[in-house]
Amino acid sequence: MKVMIDIIPRTNSVESDLILEHPDWFYWVYTDTFHEYYPPYVPGLGETLAPKPEYLPYIYSSQAVWNHIRKFSYAPNIIDPEKWNRVVKEYHETPGASILDLVSREFGLTVAPAFSDHINDVQPPWTDVTFFRMYMDHPVESQKYLGGQELPPYILFDTIKSNLYKGNIINEGLWATLSNIIPFYQQNYGIDGARIDMGHALPSELIHRIIANARTNDPDFCFIAEELQDENAKVSRDNGYNMIIGYGFFQEPRTYEHRTHKFMYDSRHLPCPVFAGGETHDTPRLAAREGGRTLSKMLTVMNMFMPNGVPFINSGQEVYEIQPMNTGLDCRNYEQYVLPHNDRYFGKLALFDKFAIHYLNHMRWELPDTLEAVSKIRKDHLSTFTKLENFVSLGFDYLSDPAIGFGYIEEGKRGHYNNNVFIIVASTDMYSPIDVTVHLEDLRTQSGNTWCTGSLLFSTHEWQREVHEFDGNRNLRVHLQPGEVKIIKL
């Protein structure tokens, strides 16, 4: 077993011991205007836009933005060092004291909550966390719009997106602290990898430090990038990540739009592996999507074999949990309330509330039993399914056919005339049986396989048997129940 942790070097709790030692690593706002603290609206732009440089003139022309900036103050130790030292002394001498309460009393300040770096995002502030100051000056690109004013550090769409908007003065002490978090866990707990939350918004130089420090201890230490856009996979790979999370949670459930097909087939072209998963802790549950448990089962099995994919199962997915942990991504307006009203966890979100997964539901064994069988096939032929050169995409009579097909040439058996290929085919119709023809021309050409008798190794709907349903062109004719997956050895 390998153990990975999740680290979030971009943010910190709004109240922590680091404030005592380094108050200037944080952003501070006046308490008398704190009730008005909210991401400012930028007129003339749409909703939820990435903070591209071409939008800066709009941002800094907004009166709401300037009203927001004026809510910020310099750190309390800069305003009055002697008073700050007295506050710290009082904190250490008072059991149970809150540093924020003391700062509020003496300075009228508090730490500024974080919010989304996307312009006009509908999300409210993230009141439990704040951003670290990655640089000790304002971003170079943003300084053009400040008119030479001396302004306190402030949180805004650009200042917190430090992969794009960098300053001239690195916060060296902070960077040293952040880049030594993983080595601490390696040396004390022997961890094997980490996901860097919001790493895409960090300066590339800091990411390189974090990765280099970890791999000094363990050259095989694995890094997962919280990169959702597949087109940025190359950047993540170049930065030293092993894999990305990707956009599967959005694409995979949309079978009728053929987004499932596009994501699964196109994954092989990415420069690094991507999560093969249809749900995360931020998204709707697969079992609560259109297609329900049928969809969840089909995707869970197919993700075990997706080319260039890293199979990912979100906690609770294995028992068809329908209540999301959070409603951060791709959620419907009723997502939080999918449980029956009389369920004790109705409306509860695991990221915020006391919650227990419904492990005792009557279907709790179906996916674990399925995965036990499927995982053995994958494990027994791991080198076959994890090398892209063994993969051959399988098509059907029509692009509109509701089916997905993967072909794999068994490792070390290319050129054999039989017993050397795997055919994995699934129906993406969740409601009706289908009959389709799986075209094997490319698979046969590349593998050398000419055989027309196969073995059904696994099906979600029938027992193992011999397979003889080939047409005159030696293509495979298959009948599939709704959401059925078949794995055939030929």
Predicted regions and their residues:
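Solvent-exposed beta-strand/loop surfaces of large extracellular or lumenal domains
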Residues: T453-N473
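Glycan-recognition surfaces
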Residues: K144-L146, E150-L151, T216-V301, F305-F312, ...
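Acidic/aromatic-lined carbohydrate-recognition and catalytic surfaces
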Residues: M1-K144, H200-Q229, S427, G483-V485
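The substrate-binding groove and active-site-proximal loops of carbohydrate-active enzymes
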Residues: V14, D158-L174, D192-A201, I244-E252, ...
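C-terminal beta-strand-rich structural cap/linker in extracellular carbohydrate-active enzymes
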Residues: E466-L490
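Active-site neighborhood of glycoside hydrolase catalytic domains
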Residues: F157-A233
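N-terminal small/glycine-rich loop or linker at the start of catalytic domains
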Residues: M134, H138-G167
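Loop/helix patches that line or flank the sugar-binding groove of alpha-linked glycan CAZymes
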Residues: G277-T280, R285, R289-G454, P482
